[in-house]
């Protein structure tokens, strides 16, 4: 049975009832800070589209935001991969002999940073002639203290690390497939005045290049004149190859009455004009370059139904209360 047929039956039932009753994820592009040391790097995320055999220079500012301590920093090259579907990356050490380790050459591998001061770390990215097309993921890491955990005077000293993430894509023929894995609301039927809406969607990629999704979400039955237009990827988040990334938004109800209002949890709250009765489409599109470098567009859609049954219940209770008060008061007035 299609949603339209369900909608028509529910709408008919709702009209009958109404008659009777009278009635919201990265890599985040924020500077990363060590847990207790106040060491900050910026920019925290860098992108490079590179030619084979070319060299590129970058500068990362390493800031000591502590009031008293001076730190000696070591420059390291690590890699990172997708962690959770919420976009938290996992930084991993490169194994000995990994060629990517040699792509980065620091002008100064070790340096000191005084309190409330900073140091500009300059390094070059040298892309080998034989590098294969595709994306490479480098974590330019700065570490305080020794290279290993040591025990001194019964105290364990562990180095602190902070990293700037570098996305390198070597030009050439790449492989990329993109699709919506999921696109759905927490339910299909809502009271437009009292129920919160939660939309969750997941985008997946396959191939050898990362993706920064571009596109929009349109709320409304006419995509040319939508009730709301929302960014598909509001934080410019990245999706690494062969992984999924979860997104979503919430729209909270306008009325707040105990026992009736049902709010939803989510980090991204948006404003949507809901019809008081009927159906409403939510459509999303994503635009990306395919393996041939041509722009491709994919679209997905869901539909929700609004029935103001809770408002009808409020009206029914109000009418019943008024009627009860009238019949209680009527004998008294009759005697008078």
Language-model segments: what does each one mean?
Residues 42, 53-59, 119-121, 133-139, ...:
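Short, solvent-exposed loop/turn segments enriched in Ser/Thr/Gly
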Residues 38-42, 87-109, 221-235:
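Short beta-strand and strand-turn-strand segments in soluble, beta-rich domains
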Residues 57-63, 70-77, 89, 101-154:
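Ligand-binding face of N-terminal immunoglobulin V-set domains in extracellular IgSF glycoproteins
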Residues 49-52, 111-119, 235-245:
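Short proline/glycine- and polar residue-rich coil/turn motifs
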Residues 297, 301-336:
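C-terminal single-pass membrane-anchor helix
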Residues 173-310:
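Membrane-proximal extracellular "stem/stalk" segments
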Residues 33-56, 181-192:
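N-terminal edge beta-strand
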Residues 70-98, 142, 204, 208-225:
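Short acidic, flexible loop segments centered on an aromatic residue
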